[in-house]
Each structure stands twice: as C-alpha cells, then as structure tokens.
Amino acid sequence: MNRRNFLKTTAAGAAVLPTFSILHAEEGVIGPADDQLNIAIIGYGAEGEILTDDCVKIPGIRIRALCDIWEVRRKMAKGRLRALGHNINIYEDYREMLDKEDKNIDAVVVATPDWMHAEHACYCLRKGKPVYCEKEMSNQLSRAREMVLAARETGLPLQIGHQRRSNPRYMHAINTVMRENRVLGRITHAYAQWNRSVAPFTTIKSSRLNIPIETLQKYGYENMEQFLNWRWFAKYGGGPMVDLGSHQIDLFFWVWDCAPIAVTAVGGNDYYNRQMNDNVMAIYQFKTKEGLINRAFYQVLTTSSRGGFYEQFMGEDGYLTLSEISARGNTAAPEPGKDWTRFTKMGILNESKAPVPLAVERSNDISLDSRVTKAAAGLPLPVELVKPAHMPHLENFFLAVRRKDAKLLNCDAELAYESAVAVLAANRSVAEGKTIYFKPEDFKVPADAKHDPAKAMGEQPKNA
C-alpha cells in the first residue's frame, strides 16, 4: 500500500489506518543468529514499505532501526515489525539514528524522495555503512556524482535500486537469450513504455495525521502537499520520466552494452498543469562498440494506463517482449522463416504455447488484443521469478555486504550513474526543445573528481 491508497481523501482519515496491509508472522523470517545482518531503514513511504516487507522475508536480515519524518508512518512500521519479531527503534532524524545505532547496524536501506538520496547515502557510507538506495540516484547529476565519489572513497557497497538487474528472468532474457546466444540476431530497435494514469494530488483532510508544519519546513518541505506528492515538484523529483523511465531506459544500456549518443524528447505539462512533465516521448540513439547505430523509443503517460508497462527488443531474427509482470511480457517470437528449434532444445526458450500480445491491458485484465492477421507463435522464457520483484536485488546487496565485496553488486553507483545521465537528459531535451548530444565522458565521474559536501547536502536542483 502506498501513501495514496493509505490516505484516502475523506474527512475520516483515521478510519483508513486499520486497512494497512499486514504481513503474516510466518513471513517474518530472521534466520540463524550467526548469519544475521542488522539493518536500518531510512524512509517508510510507498517504496520504503515494499523494501521493508521484502527484507523481513530474507533469512538472516533483522531490522534494528527505522527513520521517517512522519510520525504516523514510524509508529505503524514499529508495530508491524515488532509483531514479526524485529525489536526496532524508530527515529525522526536519520543522523540521530545513525549516531545512536552505530554499533547495532551493519547496512542501511534508503527509500526517501530522490532529492535526499545523496545526502542520506553519503552520510551512511561515511559512517561505515553499506547502502541500498532506491533509484533514481538523484534528480540532480551533481548529487549523483557525490554518491559515486562516496562509494569510491569508502569502498563500501552502494547498490542502486534498478531491481531488474537482479531479476533472473531479465538476466536470462538479456544475458543468455539476446547477448550470449544472439537469438534475436542484431537488435536494431527497442521500445518501452510505462503508461499509468494518476489521481489528483494526495491530500489529508484529518489534520491530526499531518506532519507539523515546523517539522516539514525543518526537512525542506513547504507543506504537506509537497511532501505527499514530491515526485511532481522540481525541487524533490524528476517527474514520471525519471521516476518510471529510469527502470526501463537502464535496460537499453544493458542490452547494447553502450551509452546513447543522443536523445530527442517531446512532452509537457499538458493535462495536470504541474511542475513536472505529465507525458514524455523520447528517442535515444545508441552507437555500439562495433559502430552500429541502434534506436530506442520510450514513452511515459500519466493520463492513460493503456498497455501498462513493458519492454520490447526487436532484432533481425525476431523480437522479445518483457515485463516485470510476466503476463504482460515473457515471450520471444521469430521472424517468418526463422527456425528456433535449436533454442528450445537447448532450454533457452520453451515450446510455443501462446500468441505474443502487442500490448496488454492493466494487470487485472490480461486479455490479448484482437487481430486481423494471425499472431506469431510466442516462445516463453523458461525462467520465472517466484519472489517479490525487489527481493533478488536486495539479496544481491546483502551478499556483497556479507562478503565485504562491492564488486558483487549487480547495479553499483558507477553503473547507475550512466542511466541517470540519460534519463535526466530527456527532461532537459523537453525543456530546451532540442536534441541533447552526449560524449562518452558524460557518463563517467572523472577519476580525479573531488568530493564537495555542499553538492550532496541541499543544493537547489534544476529541472534536469
């Protein structure tokens, strides 16, 4: 449940409290004491709740402390986690938590609004704590650079939450199907979308649930509306293009093993009249190490949920459709005349069992589109994720923490910085009305770059 669902826009705000989802006690797996990692959570909003729920299901993970500036959420987290056997302490201020719990914490999970990621992650790293930080690294590149520098300086694991990088189905599709066995041949184009209609701004009509205004202002928010809807304000987030697009644009880097050379994007605030773009359509051009030009189209819409979210990779020999929800995309299809029997015999793909959907409706309606022509036979991927989507990425992080080896991470700060550059550039392209061209060095933080604490602690961000 996210903040929007939790806080219905009714006068009886308190009445929604009992509807909060409850984990069964048997799901709160802790594991043997000699293999435990004690962790802290910073931020218990929608994403923080998801990550916390996944953490408690991983053997050997004990949550010892949690921080959120909203007292309602802190107390709710405390009640839930203590019921699952996690004797946690709760805090309003992350610095107080890290100072008091220093000897009790092995690692920290950060799930705060984007503008605070750098401040929280850098502070934790320099306190000697490995960090799992939700994407996007930041809504400002200067802050994302500080995260890279802090990880370099400390040598500690800093995992960025592009969880598809640890999803076994995505790993099989990209590494095994597309890259190692070249089932699709040369992949010339890619398409991805995340269409999700959004509700009006979340509000709270029961004033007793609000964060006191002095507390909000202490932590950089003018009012409760900004706090609840931070993704739509330039100071705090990058809008839907950054919030949603970062997951999928990262896949283009992974598939082609290179960074883009240009992005051209159009969009605007055409429906909701908010600070950040409510729709964006972007074309990325990639130049591979072999000198080949490939293109990818990405769109994010907030006025319609048509087709939901999925990715499609198109090659000379066939195409493959993916989605975190397998009903929306879990199949590859050959071009006419291509025989993929050898790939099914090798176990790379399963036998044909269903047509490939051009697009699939929202998750509660997975009926296929009607067609005039016969659908191509889809060969399903033989790998299915049977865990929550974020859990493998968290497990990968905890493995790196236990082994004290940041090289084990599937998405460290250096890698995530590359996609941050590309995603933030799309907003810039919209704002400036022009194509943004990249140089290879744009995607790397220079080896001789110097740490600037001010850039991680409160620099006023721009819409780029």
Residue ranges of model-derived segments:
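N-terminal Rossmann-like dinucleotide-binding module
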Residues: 13-84, 167, 252
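A structured beta-alpha segment of the ubiquitous adenosine-cofactor-binding alpha/beta core
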Residues: 88-106, 110
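Beta-strand-loop-alpha-helix segment that lines the small-molecule cofactor/substrate pocket
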Residues: 113-114, 118-166
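Predominantly a Rossmann-like dinucleotide-binding segment in NAD(P)-dependent oxidoreductases
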Residues: 43, 47, 153-159, 164-274, ...
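Active-site beta-strand termini and strand-to-loop segments that position acidic
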Residues: 284-289, 315
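N-terminal secretory signal peptides and thylakoid transit peptides that target proteins
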Residues: 1-14
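C-terminal helical cap and adjacent loop that interface with cofactors, partners, or active-site loops
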Residues: 10-13, 50, 224, 244-254, ...
